[in-house]
Amino acid sequence: MNMYHDADRALLDPMETASVDALRQHQLERLRWSLKHAYDNVPLYRQRFAECGAHPDDLTCLEDLAKFPFTGKNDLRDNYPYGMFAVPQEEVVRLHASSGTTGKPTVVGYTQNDINTWANVVARSIRAAGGRKGDKVHVSYGYGLFTGGLGAHYGAERLGCTVIPMSGGQTEKQVQLIRDFQPDIIMVTPSYMLNLADEIERQGIDPHDLKLRLGIFGAEPWTDELRRSIEQRLGINALDIYGLSEIMGPGVAMECIETKDGPTIWEDHFYPEIIDPVTGEVLPDGQLGELVFTSLSKEALPMVRYRTRDLTRLLPGTARPMRRIGKITGRSDDMLIIRGVNVFPTQIEEQVLKIKQLSEMYEIHLYRNGNLDSVEVHVELRAECQHLDEGQRKLVIGELSKQIKTYIGISTQVHLQACGTLKRSEGKACHVYDKRLAS
């Protein structure tokens, strides 16, 4: 059911108000174009399609996409840097790349049309979150090869907002500018927003004296408990933006302010599937699995059935006719196997945030003790709970240990530390320190 206000209807793109049938017809036409574009211009796709016995002309309905092969991050690395580009080099106006923590980075390219599409979907995302022309947007995503900063920047400008291009880091200065410039919206990772919230409190600033009303958070998974914590501490609406560089960057999906029930996928540009991460079988909507995207409008770097490794489910549309992404429970490649139990860091986070005496900061340390895994969870007391005596602290430790055992099924050693002890992030947070191989 569409829940936008009639007064805002004129602001929406036509596909945001289209019928589901019209959307599916648009997707079919764009899929045919995208598959042919990839097949005609990228040798890897031509080879893979042939190996599967598939040809772009075989796509007669959306379900036929399952006949085509998957693409993964390793394909981009194996064809580094430009082997998967589908246009001549002179048509590529922008290059971005992943951080490349292991091996070669993944390189993504954009034509001018791609840049325009990207700006449009991010502008649509900010508007869906409640942003409007004339709002001031404080961008704390990193600028540079990372797509977050520039993606947010050009989308905000396309919407007609005033952009404050702060980038990451310099936390004290960030807060100074938030106080002085009075932005309406902040775009940042949720973990760094916690860092900024701590600094706002440290400087004695009342959040009600700030003009911030919206936080658009992405680039890492976060829980509903963390959302509530941020909203309560800062008095803002916290919304989830989803994206990945290989598909476009931020702006692939965006939570809508009307419903705040998970990011709406901009399905006129990105076609989603959910698959079994082991077998590759396409799963029905509503079932948990790995999210896969096929680009529908990208020129420089078309992506066919790209495996994101994000574990989620597809849900019916609410604020828009497009489907939504359920809360991402983790990644198929960051799942921890601890004494035979599959564990995702976000599951630990959920339990930490249920305990009112604890801050949002946590670390998971994994060791090998003989033939067994040993798990330590390091957490912090909130600043206002520093006065707790030893007995009270033991109760907090016991409560967290019990909850993790009950809800996740593993035994842990909980280490309770003073407020401000754990490392703060200026970008994507690192919560897991796996030292089992070194043990």
From Swiss-Prot:
Keywords: Ligase, Nucleotide-binding
Regulation: Inhibited by divalent cations (zinc, copper, mercury) and by the sulfhydryl reagents 5,5-dithiobis(2-nitrobenzoic acid), N-ethylmaleimide and p-chloromercuribenzoate.
EC category: ligase
Enzyme Commission number(s): 6.2.1.30
Disruption phenotype: Mutant does not activate PA to PA-CoA but can completely catabolize all molecules that synthesize PA-CoA through other routes.
Catalyzed reaction equations: 2-phenylacetate + ATP + CoA = phenylacetyl-CoA + AMP + diphosphate
InterPro entries, alphabetized: Adenylate-forming_Reductase, AMP-bd_C_sf, AMP-dep_Lig_C, AMP-dep_synth/lig_dom, ANL_N_sf, PA_CoA_lig_proteobact_actino, PA_CoA_ligase
One term of GO molecular function: phenylacetate-CoA ligase activity
Induction line: Induced by phenylacetate.
UniProt record, GO biological process: phenylacetate catabolic process
Protein's pathway: Aromatic compound metabolism; phenylacetate degradation
SUPFAM superfamilies reported in the protein's UniProt record: Acetyl-CoA synthetase-like
Activity profile over pH: Optimum pH is 8.2.
Family: Belongs to the phenylacetyl-CoA ligase family.
Described function: Catalyzes the activation of phenylacetic acid (PA) to phenylacetyl-CoA (PA-CoA). Involved in the phenylalanine metabolism. Can also use CTP and UTP as substrate.
Quaternary structure note: Monomer.
Protein known as: Phenylacetate-coenzyme A ligase
Organism (species): Pseudomonas putida (Arthrobacter siderocapsulatus)
